Amino acid sequence: MLAGLLTWSLFEYVMHRYLFHLALPTEWGRRFVFLMHGNHHDDPDDPWRSIMPPIVSVTWSGAIWAAMAWALGGAGTVLFLGFILGYVVYDAVHFACHRLPVRGRLMRMLRRHHLRHHHGREEGNYAITAMFWDHVFGTYLSAKKAAGSAPRADA
């Protein structure tokens, strides 16, 4: 299960950095990225844009579980349980960052980290639940760094 949580956290970072902020050359491609994630940046406080629609989550989850089970057998299902737990935690944390009063030092840190991505520079702070990935990949934005430039208009 722990391996599944770690796998989720890396998946979350990679998807957010490379897929959700992908700059595609065609109008169709830009529209696809906008519908997938850009609309969340247009209105980050809209509760309907803070979590994935269930049909998308269920479809992706089924495909990921099938791949893990095929590759690892029964261990793949255990890995997937940790992965899906990570996803549920991610959705709850992400929703709370935008919509709920947060309590506790960790939640305040996660909120601050994520909101720098929205209100500072979109080129950093891609991790929502595991900020260490931004440090590992050099995309961490401190308050000073995030305030040092305007948000991108194309994401």
Segment roles from a protein language model:
Residues E12, R17-A155:
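Membrane-embedded catalytic scaffold of the fatty acid hydroxylase/desaturase
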Residues M1-S9:
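Loop-to-helix transition at the N-terminal end of transmembrane alpha-helices
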